[in-house]
């Protein structure tokens, strides 16, 4: 790209450094990649859009970084004799599928401050820089910490998180299936007591308490955040341990089922046989306790 177009320029005429980062969200950002996991990516740059590259075939900085992003996606989604390398999901970028492929750092901040929904801040908890400019990475981390730790009204946050969880339940859970199916099966990821409940508990805790406990912003993965919640005595040692072990057990079960090309929905008999029911019940108990209005402090 630079051989063809030159290097993007800063406002002072100095070449960028390259002022571009790739941010991983979801399982990639949370260091929890599994078999068949896709890549949730967001591309950010910090070069003036009104300026251009310094090559003979000069193009606008914004166009340059968009083409870089397109090239990266093309390489990551390459098909080989063994199948596709990865699936790439860009929907977590500002404004989702209708947004720019590459967002400026200033634009990212404005969006998160003025337009982003609470669920987008939940997603940001699992975001980390994968590669790119060290300078822009530092600025992104600063923005992430600032956004996640902004003051929030406890009851409003609780209702927004519960509302989003309810929407996920409507789409993915057995709650819309026949009553008999609901009673006799358990979806390891989306049903009550599953992985999403644990993730939402952790995300809620970060948004709720990080203003006063910046230690919660150190990590993007659920396990280490739960360890910090225990250290800060925001969660009891017993509850934090239950959630960590439940998360690991459920993720491990999904990995095995994926390798066997089986769905991540088990009969309750299988759930008992795999030793997962005690984790399911513990997660439901902690979820209920966490989201009780009178439990907020």
Where do the protein language model's features map onto the residues?
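A nucleotide- and high-energy phosphate-metabolite-utilizing enzyme signature
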Residues: 1-297
């Amino acid at each position: 790209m630079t051989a063809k177009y030159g290097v993007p320029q800063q406002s002072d005429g100095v070449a960028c450094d390259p002022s571009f980062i790739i941010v991983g969200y979801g399982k990639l950002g949370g260091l929890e990649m599994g078999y068949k996991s896709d890549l949730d990516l967001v591309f950010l740059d910090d070069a003036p859009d009104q300026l251009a590259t310094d090559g003979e075939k000069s193009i606008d900085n914004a166009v340059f970084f968009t083409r870089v992003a397109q090239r990266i996606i093309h390489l990551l989604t390459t098909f080989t004799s063994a199948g596709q390398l990865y699936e790439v999901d860009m929907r977590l970028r500002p404004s989702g599928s209708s947004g720019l492929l590459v967002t400026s750092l200033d634009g990212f901040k404005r969006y998160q401050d003025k337009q982003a929904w609470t669920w987008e801040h939940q997603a940001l908890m699992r975001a980390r820089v994968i590669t790119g400019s060290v300078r822009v990475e530092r600025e992104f981390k600063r923005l992430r910490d600032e956004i996640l730790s902004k003051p929030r009204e406890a009851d409003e946050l609780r209702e927004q998180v519960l509302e989003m969880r309810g929407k996920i339940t409507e789409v993915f859970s057995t709650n819309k299936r026949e009553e008999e199916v609901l009673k006799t099966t358990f979806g390891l990821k989306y049903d009550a007591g599953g992985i999403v409940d644990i993730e939402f508990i952790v995300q809620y805790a970060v948004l709720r308490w990080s203003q006063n406990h910046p230690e919660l912003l150190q990590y993007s993965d659920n396990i280490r955040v739960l360890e910090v919640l225990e250290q800060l005595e925001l969660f009891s040692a017993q509850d934090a341990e239950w959630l960590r072990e439940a998360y690991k057990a459920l993720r491990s079960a999904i990995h095995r089922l994926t390798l066997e090309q089986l769905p991540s929905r088990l009969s309750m008999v299988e759930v008992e046989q795999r030793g997962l029911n005690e984790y399911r019940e513990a997660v439901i108990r902690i979820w209920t306790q966490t989201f009780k209005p009178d439990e907020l402090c």
